[in-house]
Amino acid sequence: MINRNANRDRDRSRSNDKELKINYRIKAREVRVIFENGIQEVLSIEDAIKKAKEAGLDLVEVSPNVSPPVCKIIDYGKYKFHQEKRQKEQKKNQKVIKLKEVRMQPKIDTHDLDFKSKNILSFLKDGNKVKVTIRFRGRELAHTYLGYDILNSILEKVGEVNYVLESAAKMEGKTMFLIVAPKFKK
């Protein structure tokens, strides 16, 4: 017989792991309680829940992996709201850096090279990393120095932007590449 709810049950258990245990869901016998004013005390779970109820607040397990587990007496709704707000703020401030790739061959014309250099420049100004790839075919492999010359000329043209050479020109099989990243101001 196939259990059709197995995936649903597994997903529920994952979401419950992220949830904090509050009040009677805490399974430990003793807990280290941090009160609103910052005072710490080791209490039995019953006493800790009683003190939380007297204050009109919740006993929230903050750090379950310590012995005894650390709990705070706080308003759970406010605590969860502030945590979600902090996560949204961190996500908003997080900068996503993409890796853009510009491909070419060693037989590239000067105008095409200028055009590709402008593209690389715009990618770097947007804050993206750029992987410049030169693909060699057939007899072109005997003239890899052309690839180094092309990559050096690109770096000279891109020199007006502050950049960091993340990996110097390397040959991997029939391709030569380098990775350039923008230098961020701190």
From Swiss-Prot:
Look up the domain of life of the source: Bacteria
Give all cystine bridges in this chain.
none
GO terms under cellular component = cytosol; membrane
Q: Which GO terms describe its biological process?
A: ribosome disassembly
Pfam families given for it?
IF3_C, IF3_N
Q: Which InterPro entries match?
A: T_IF-3_C_sf, T_IF-3_N_sf, Translation_initiation_fac3_CS, Translation_initiation_fac_3, Translation_initiation_fac_3_C, Translation_initiation_fac_3_N
The record's PROSITE patterns line, in alphabetical order, gives: IF3
Q: Which UniProt keywords apply?
A: Cytoplasm, Initiation factor, Protein biosynthesis
Where does it reside?
A: Cytoplasm
Q: Where are the transmembrane segments?
A: none
Gene Ontology MF term list: ribosome binding; translation initiation factor activity
**Assembly, per entry:** Monomer.
Please give the function described in this protein's UniProt entry: IF-3 binds to the 30S ribosomal subunit and shifts the equilibrium between 70S ribosomes and their 50S and 30S subunits in favor of the free subunits, thus enhancing the availability of 30S subunits on which protein synthesis initiation begins.
Q: Which family does it belong to?
A: Belongs to the IF-3 family.
Protein name per the record: Translation initiation factor IF-3
Task: Tell me what organism the protein belongs to.
Answer: Borrelia garinii subsp. bavariensis (strain ATCC BAA-2496 / DSM 23469 / PBi)
Q: Which gene encodes it?
A: infC
